[in-house]
Amino acid sequence: MGAQIRELRRRIKSAGAIKKITKAQELIATSRIAKAQARVVAARPYATEITNVLTALADDAALDHPLLVERPEPKRAGVLIVSSDRGLCGGYNANVLRVAEELYALLREQGKTPVVYVVGRKALNYYSFRNRKVTEAWTGFSERPEYASAQKIADTLVEAFLAGADDEGDDPGLDGILGVDELHIVYTEFKSMLTQAAVAKRIAPMEVEYVGEAAGPTTQYSFEPDATTLFGALLPRYLATRVYAALLEAAASESASRRRAMKAATDNADELIKGLTLEANGARQAQITQEISEIVGGVNALADAAGH
């Protein structure tokens, strides 16, 4: 009986230690969500304005930029998968990788070879464990992405896309680089504290649309030196903005998923501690009852012996 009580107390102590860790992680994630949401909101005006400027440029310039032109028979598709660097965030990474696998299968059905790029150690480990090629990976900033990181990723993707313009099947063409004909991104959209959704979107060839108040007046722009030159200079930045927005949404989603997972773990630890405490109290009561019974039995035996 004593050994059972000691084991229960040991388990209560272990559950309490785990609860402290999960509660701390929950509080940290909660504080990061607000900051991540603020960064998402702060980045939107720039994304909106660069989209509007590009739309105005597109109206004024000939739409023949390589990033806008559909290729007749696309053979290779670049897929950027945004995951987390750390775990303990529930089904966050599993959902992203599930959508990525669905896109992978769809591209295969369409006769396209997926070329994988990843952000975050979890996606990198996933593909490395399965011996599947990752063309390039970026890690270490999933919880707090910076624009410089998004720019570096976008530069790599744009370079691969432009290199694919002269490819013929597996022939890399004149530049000697085997590029891609499409670019897709898989990440998690942050909708609310309770809702995040993994999505896959094509980002090249791009379709530029006006973003703003539908009923409001559009801004008139004057372009120097000319619309075509500015269009070519801004389009890669637009792609970097799309990547950065996805990274920010993913960071907010990661923190929200981690908070939800850690809260569930903390609640489970509470329930476990309550159950083990009741069990330990019951065992202790049984032990006391047994000891009292043994004492009473001993007293009665002594009394009987004295009576004789």
UniProtKB/Swiss-Prot annotation:
Coiled coil: none annotated. It is a peripheral membrane protein. The keyword Cell membrane applies. InterPro entries: ATP_synth_F1_ATPase_gsu (IPR035968), ATP_synth_F1_gsu (IPR000131). Its main location: membrane. One of its GO terms (cellular component) is proton-transporting ATP synthase complex. It comes from the Bacteria. Keywords: ATP synthesis, Cell membrane, CF(1), Hydrogen ion transport, Ion transport, Membrane, Transport. It holds the Pfam family ATP-synt. GO terms for molecular function: ATP binding; proton-transporting ATP synthase activity, rotational mechanism. SUPFAM superfamilies: ATP synthase (F1-ATPase), gamma subunit (SSF52943). It is found in: Cell membrane. The keyword Cell membrane applies. GO terms for biological process: proton motive force-driven plasma membrane ATP synthesis. Belongs to the ATPase gamma chain family. F-type ATPases have 2 components, CF(1) - the catalytic core - and CF(0) - the membrane proton channel. CF(1) has five subunits: alpha(3), beta(3), gamma(1), delta(1), epsilon(1). CF(0) has three main subunits: a, b and c. Produces ATP from ADP in the presence of a proton gradient across the membrane. The gamma chain is believed to be important in regulating ATPase activity and the flow of protons through the CF(0) complex. PANTHER family: ATP SYNTHASE GAMMA CHAIN (PTHR11693), ATP SYNTHASE SUBUNIT GAMMA, MITOCHONDRIAL (PTHR11693:SF22). This is ATP synthase gamma chain. It comes from Mycobacteroides abscessus (strain ATCC 19977 / DSM 44196 / CCUG 20993 / CIP 104536 / JCM 13569 / NCTC 13031 / TMC 1543 / L948).
